[in-house]
Amino acid sequence: TVDTQLHIYEEIIRRHNRPKRDRDGVVICGAYGRGNAGDDAILEAILQEMRSIDPDMPITVLTKDPKATRLTYRVRTAGRMDVGTWKKAMRHAGLYINGGGSLIQDVTSRRSLWFYLHNIQAAHKAGCKVQMYGCGIGPVLREQHRKLAASVLNASVDVITLREPDSLKELQSMGVTKPEILLTADPAL
C-alpha cells in the first residue's frame, strides 16, 4: 500500500540522517536461528528493548540461520561460525549482548561454553561494552570450566542481568565478583 511504501521511505531517510559514530550499535549472541520458540522470544524482547532506545540502532545478530533471522527480525546477521564477519561487527559496535537462556553451562556441551566465553572475550578485546542479558547461569560442573568462566566474566563483562536467584548463587560460588550483577526476570516473559 501507499502507507507502507511511505513508511519504508521515511525509515530510509531517518536512518540516512542518523548521526554517524565511531562505535555504534549492538551485536547480540545467543542460541538463535534454531527454531526454538523460547530463544526466539528472548531475541524479540532484546530487539524491542534496543529499538525502544534507538529505532535505527544498527543491530547484528549471531545466528545459526542468518537468512531467516535477517528476514524475520530486520537485522544484520552473521553466521555463528563466520568468525571474520562477527569480529568485524564487534569492532564497530558499542555494545555486545550475550543473551538469554542458560548459555554459561557445561551440561549440554563444553564446546558451547567455550564458544560463548570466547565471544565474550573477543567482544571485550574489540572494545565493546559487554552485557549478559536475562541469563540463567549453570550448572557449570567441571572445576576447570568454573575457573575459566569466572576468569572471563570477571575480566570481560560489564554487567550481568540474571533471570533467577539460583544463577546468582552459581556466579557467587564460582567467584564472579567484578561485573555489576542484577537479579531481574526472564526477558521473554
What feature does the model see in each segment?
Residues 18-141, 188-189:
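Aromatic- and Gly/Pro-rich donor/ligand-binding loops
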Residues 142-189:
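A nucleotide-sugar donor-handling region in carbohydrate enzymes
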Residues 1-16:
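A charged, aromatic-enriched C-terminal amphipathic alpha-helix characteristic of glycosyltransferases
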Residues 3-6, 44, 165:
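Generic alpha-helical structural signal
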